[in-house]
Amino acid sequence: MNLIEQLEREEIERLGKTIPDFSPGDTLVVNVNVVEGDRKRVQAFEGVVIAKRNRGLNSSFIVRKISSGEAVERTFQTYSPLIASMEVKRRGAVRRAKLYYLRDRSGKAARIREKLPARSVQQENVAEALQP
């Protein structure tokens, strides 16, 4: 194991942040700490994850949303102290790791299908038992 990787892993553990499991296509709500003068408040940024960059402590992700008809993209550092919390609102079914093509699309063309939860073996057995 590399010394730098070990230090990064220890730093991530020290931060103790709970990062939800998300992937591109998911709708994510990121609560960000915003400092305005002497006041500190939490601002929610909800949008679709269009890219995720996994680099240990330097991991980041890009969230895109449409605000008042204008597209807004924001890059977040995954382990940033500015992020108060993250929540996955909706899982998206996509076949790409980077969804940059959404930048060229608007309206219904920019929709993402919802990923349905996988059926477990137990559910299938119950469904078969219920059929006459």
Swiss-Prot record:
Classification of source organism: Bacteria, Pseudomonadati, Pseudomonadota, Betaproteobacteria, Nitrosomonadales
Pfam families in the record: Ribosomal_L19
Descriptive protein name: Large ribosomal subunit protein bL19
GO cellular component terms listed in the entry, alphabetical order: cytosolic large ribosomal subunit
GO BP term (any one): translation
Signal peptide: none
Organism name: Nitrosomonas europaea (strain ATCC 19718 / CIP 103999 / KCTC 2705 / NBRC 14298)
Keywords noted in UniProt: Ribonucleoprotein, Ribosomal protein
Purpose of the protein: This protein is located at the 30S-50S ribosomal subunit interface and may play a role in the structure and function of the aminoacyl-tRNA binding site.
GO MF term (any one): structural constituent of ribosome
Family: Belongs to the bacterial ribosomal protein bL19 family.
Gene that this sequence comes from: rplS
